[in-house]
Protein backbone atom coordinates (compact mmCIF):
# COMPACT_ATOMS: atom_id res chain seq x y z
CA UNK A 1 0.00 0.00 0.00
CA UNK A 2 1.39 3.38 -0.95
CA UNK A 3 1.60 6.27 1.40
CA UNK A 4 -0.03 9.61 0.72
CA UNK A 5 -3.18 10.69 -0.98
CA UNK A 6 -4.26 9.38 -4.35
CA UNK A 7 -6.63 12.22 -5.12
CA UNK A 8 -6.04 14.60 -7.98
CA UNK A 9 -5.26 18.15 -6.93
CA UNK A 10 -6.78 19.65 -10.06
CA UNK A 11 -9.81 19.47 -12.33
CA UNK A 12 -9.52 18.93 -16.05
CA UNK A 13 -11.62 21.05 -18.43
CA UNK A 14 -15.19 19.86 -18.93
CA UNK A 15 -14.97 19.87 -22.72
CA UNK A 16 -11.95 18.15 -24.31
CA UNK A 17 -11.61 20.38 -27.36
CA UNK A 18 -12.25 24.10 -27.30
CA UNK A 19 -9.86 25.83 -29.67
CA UNK A 20 -9.85 29.17 -27.85
CA UNK A 21 -9.18 27.58 -24.44
CA UNK A 22 -6.41 25.41 -25.86
CA UNK A 23 -4.77 28.45 -27.47
CA UNK A 24 -4.94 30.40 -24.18
CA UNK A 25 -3.48 27.46 -22.26
CA UNK A 26 -0.65 27.13 -24.79
CA UNK A 27 0.12 30.83 -24.42
CA UNK A 28 0.26 30.55 -20.61
CA UNK A 29 2.44 27.42 -20.81
CA UNK A 30 4.93 29.27 -23.00
CA UNK A 31 4.86 32.55 -21.07
CA UNK A 32 5.41 30.93 -17.66
CA UNK A 33 7.53 27.94 -18.77
CA UNK A 34 5.14 25.33 -17.40
CA UNK A 35 6.00 21.70 -18.11
CA UNK A 36 2.50 20.53 -18.98
CA UNK A 37 -1.15 21.51 -18.73
CA UNK A 38 -1.52 19.66 -15.44
CA UNK A 39 0.56 22.40 -13.77
CA UNK A 40 -1.76 25.03 -15.24
CA UNK A 41 -4.89 23.12 -14.21
CA UNK A 42 -3.49 22.75 -10.68
CA UNK A 43 -3.03 26.52 -10.49
CA UNK A 44 -6.52 27.11 -11.86
CA UNK A 45 -7.94 24.78 -9.20
CA UNK A 46 -6.03 26.68 -6.52
CA UNK A 47 -7.52 29.94 -7.80
CA UNK A 48 -10.98 28.32 -7.85
CA UNK A 49 -10.54 27.38 -4.17
CA UNK A 50 -9.55 30.97 -3.30
CA UNK A 51 -12.65 32.34 -5.03
CA UNK A 52 -14.87 29.70 -3.42
CA UNK A 53 -13.55 30.63 0.03
CA UNK A 54 -14.08 34.36 -0.64
CA UNK A 55 -17.66 33.73 -1.81
CA UNK A 56 -18.32 31.60 1.28
CA UNK A 57 -17.01 34.33 3.59
CA UNK A 58 -19.01 37.06 1.85
CA UNK A 59 -22.10 34.82 2.01
CA UNK A 60 -21.63 34.17 5.74
CA UNK A 61 -21.36 37.91 6.30
CA UNK A 62 -24.50 38.45 4.19
CA UNK A 63 -22.68 40.72 1.76
CA UNK A 64 -20.99 42.96 4.34
CA UNK A 65 -17.36 43.15 3.14
CA UNK A 66 -15.92 44.39 6.46
CA UNK A 67 -17.52 41.50 8.39
CA UNK A 68 -16.33 39.04 5.73
CA UNK A 69 -12.78 40.36 6.07
CA UNK A 70 -12.93 39.90 9.84
CA UNK A 71 -14.14 36.30 9.39
CA UNK A 72 -11.47 35.51 6.80
CA UNK A 73 -8.55 37.38 8.30
CA UNK A 74 -6.21 34.35 8.15
CA UNK A 75 -7.24 33.65 4.55
CA UNK A 76 -6.54 37.25 3.47
CA UNK A 77 -3.26 37.35 5.43
CA UNK A 78 -2.07 34.27 3.56
CA UNK A 79 -2.88 35.85 0.18
CA UNK A 80 -1.15 39.08 1.23
CA UNK A 81 1.90 37.18 2.50
CA UNK A 82 2.31 35.56 -0.91
CA UNK A 83 1.83 38.89 -2.69
CA UNK A 84 -1.34 37.81 -4.46
CA UNK A 85 -3.21 40.68 -2.78
CA UNK A 86 -1.74 44.01 -1.75
CA UNK A 87 -2.15 45.32 1.80
CA UNK A 88 -5.06 47.62 0.95
CA UNK A 89 -7.09 45.10 -1.11
CA UNK A 90 -10.33 43.80 0.36
CA UNK A 91 -11.95 40.38 0.05
CA UNK A 92 -13.94 41.32 -3.06
CA UNK A 93 -10.63 41.67 -4.94
CA UNK A 94 -10.17 37.89 -4.59
CA UNK A 95 -13.15 37.36 -6.88
CA UNK A 96 -11.37 39.33 -9.63
CA UNK A 97 -8.09 37.41 -9.50
CA UNK A 98 -6.77 35.75 -12.65
CA UNK A 99 -4.63 32.62 -13.02
CA UNK A 100 -1.68 34.80 -14.07
CA UNK A 101 -1.79 36.48 -10.62
CA UNK A 102 -1.04 33.08 -9.07
CA UNK A 103 1.52 32.07 -11.71
CA UNK A 104 3.47 35.30 -11.11
CA UNK A 105 4.21 34.19 -7.53
CA UNK A 106 5.87 30.88 -8.53
CA UNK A 107 9.59 30.57 -7.84
CA UNK A 108 10.22 29.80 -11.51
CA UNK A 109 8.61 33.05 -12.65
CA UNK A 110 10.32 35.17 -10.00
CA UNK A 111 13.77 33.75 -10.88
CA UNK A 112 13.12 34.70 -14.51
CA UNK A 113 11.70 38.16 -13.65
CA UNK A 114 14.69 38.96 -11.42
CA UNK A 115 17.04 38.27 -14.32
CA UNK A 116 18.72 35.20 -12.84
CA UNK A 117 17.71 33.24 -15.96
CA UNK A 118 17.23 34.34 -19.55
CA UNK A 119 14.02 32.32 -20.15
CA UNK A 120 11.32 30.79 -17.93
CA UNK A 121 12.42 27.30 -19.00
CA UNK A 122 16.03 28.08 -18.07
CA UNK A 123 14.77 29.29 -14.69
CA UNK A 124 13.01 25.95 -14.25
CA UNK A 125 16.21 24.08 -15.12
CA UNK A 126 18.30 26.14 -12.68
CA UNK A 127 15.81 25.36 -9.89
CA UNK A 128 15.55 21.63 -10.63
CA UNK A 129 19.35 21.32 -10.88
CA UNK A 130 19.71 22.93 -7.43
CA UNK A 131 21.42 26.15 -8.53
CA UNK A 132 18.85 28.43 -6.80
CA UNK A 133 18.47 29.09 -3.08
CA UNK A 134 15.75 30.88 -1.14
CA UNK A 135 16.96 32.26 2.21
CA UNK A 136 20.11 30.15 1.83
CA UNK A 137 18.22 26.86 1.39
CA UNK A 138 18.21 24.99 -1.91
CA UNK A 139 14.78 24.69 -3.46
CA UNK A 140 14.10 22.15 -6.20
CA UNK A 141 10.40 22.84 -6.80
CA UNK A 142 9.70 25.39 -9.56
CA UNK A 143 6.07 25.59 -8.42
CA UNK A 144 6.97 26.83 -4.91
CA UNK A 145 4.88 29.86 -4.00
CA UNK A 146 7.27 32.60 -2.92
CA UNK A 147 6.32 34.89 -0.06
CA UNK A 148 6.90 38.64 -0.39
CA UNK A 149 9.63 38.50 2.27
CA UNK A 150 11.44 35.68 0.46
CA UNK A 151 11.47 37.37 -2.96
CA UNK A 152 14.59 39.41 -2.19
CA UNK A 153 16.41 36.38 -0.75
CA UNK A 154 16.50 34.41 -4.03
CA UNK A 155 20.04 33.88 -5.32
CA UNK A 156 22.38 31.35 -6.87
CA UNK A 157 23.75 28.70 -4.52
CA UNK A 158 27.27 29.66 -3.42
CA UNK A 159 28.56 26.18 -4.41
CA UNK A 160 26.97 26.35 -7.86
CA UNK A 161 29.13 27.05 -10.91
CA UNK A 162 26.47 29.62 -11.84
CA UNK A 163 27.44 31.71 -8.81
CA UNK A 164 30.32 33.02 -10.95
CA UNK A 165 29.01 36.13 -12.73
CA UNK A 166 31.10 35.27 -15.82
CA UNK A 167 29.44 31.88 -16.32
CA UNK A 168 28.11 31.64 -19.90
CA UNK A 169 24.65 30.44 -18.81
CA UNK A 170 24.06 33.51 -16.61
CA UNK A 171 21.48 35.91 -18.00
CA UNK A 172 23.54 38.99 -17.03
CA UNK A 173 26.58 37.71 -18.93
CA UNK A 174 24.63 37.40 -22.18
CA UNK A 175 23.84 41.10 -22.46
From Swiss-Prot:
UniProt keyword terms in alphabetical order: Ribonucleoprotein, Ribosomal protein, RNA-binding, rRNA-binding
GO molecular function, one term: structural constituent of ribosome
Residues covered by the S4 RNA-binding domain: 105-169
A GO cellular-component term linked to this record: small ribosomal subunit
One Gene Ontology term from the biological process aspect of the record: translation
InterPro entries from the UniProt entry: Ribosomal_uS4 (IPR022801), Ribosomal_uS4_arc (IPR022802), Ribosomal_uS4_CS (IPR018079), Ribosomal_uS4_euk/arc (IPR005710), Ribosomal_uS4_N (IPR001912), S4_RNA-bd (IPR002942), S4_RNA-bd_sf (IPR036986)
Domain of life per record: Archaea
Self-association state and partner proteins as the record states: Part of the 30S ribosomal subunit. Contacts protein S5. The interaction surface between S4 and S5 is involved in control of translational fidelity.
NCBIfam families noted in UniProt: PRK04051.1 (NF003139), uS4_arch (TIGR01018)
Function, as annotated: One of the primary rRNA binding proteins, it binds directly to 16S rRNA where it nucleates assembly of the body of the 30S subunit. With S5 and S12 plays an important role in translational accuracy.
Protein family according to the UniProt entry: Belongs to the universal ribosomal protein uS4 family.
Protein name per its UniProtKB record: Small ribosomal subunit protein uS4
Natural source organism: Haloquadratum walsbyi (strain DSM 16790 / HBSQ001)
Gene behind this protein: rps4
